[in-house]
Amino acid sequence: MGIVTSRFNAGSLRQIKLCLIAAPMNAVDFASLLCSRLCHDLMSPVGALNNGIELLADETDPEMREKCLELLADSARATANKLKFFRLAFGAGGGFADEIDTGEAQAALEGLFGGEGKVQLGWVVSDEKLPKGAIKLLLNLSLLAGDALVRGGQLDVGAERRTGEIELAVRAEGPRILLDPVLRQTLATGGSGTIEPRAAAAWLAHHLAGEAGGTIKLSDPTSDVLMIGAVIPA
């Protein structure tokens, strides 16, 4: 048993065999799904930018104008952080190299979850670089676990490269954890029927692991702590 797995209390994890007989989805379908997810996530900070600009145009009080500028800065930062994360997790971020700097992945996660201060990030990755597929899988698992912390909490993210394999583990703990059953099913089996935009990360994580010849692990739905992991060939 690896260092990462034992650190994340792997004894309570149940292994789920990846089922590759899920409903097929072509590239156009997935592109549409992903675009819907990105638009949904960017709507709030971009909308706040628009509101801030409108307020600034009508406001003459110096103090209120200063607050408008602060709102604009916060919204612009949130938008940029989301785009940086999505580029690495969903797109071709990291260039065309086979491996990606893990520090870039850490910075992307810190930018995504660190702004509001609701989620505290623990980074347990010692390797300076990991394969691009492993980084994408780790980020998508982290996104799912972080979103499940509806009232905030602790999100620990770990990875370990061993001989012949790479082990990834994400642990979420907080006052309320909610991983939607649809997301859980999509993550474990690839889903069935029409996949919703909110399940884009789960669908991608499932297929990233499956195409790499790996397995996915999930903690029991009744557990007080959410743990998601994967083991893929190095």
What would you call each of these model-derived segments?
Residues 57-63:
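Short acidic helix/loop segment immediately C-terminal to the autophosphorylated histidine
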Residues 16-30:
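Conserved signal-transmission helix
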Residues 213-220:
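Glycine-rich ATP-binding loops of the HATPase_c
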Residues 32-51, 59, 133-159, 203-208:
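Conserved ATP-binding N-box helix of the HATPase_c
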Residues 26-33, 118-146, 150, 191-194:
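Conserved short strand/loop->alpha-helix "switch" segment adjacent to the catalytic nucleotide/phosphoryl-transfer site
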Residues 166-199:
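Glycine-rich/acidic phosphate-handling loop/turn and adjacent ATP-lid/helix
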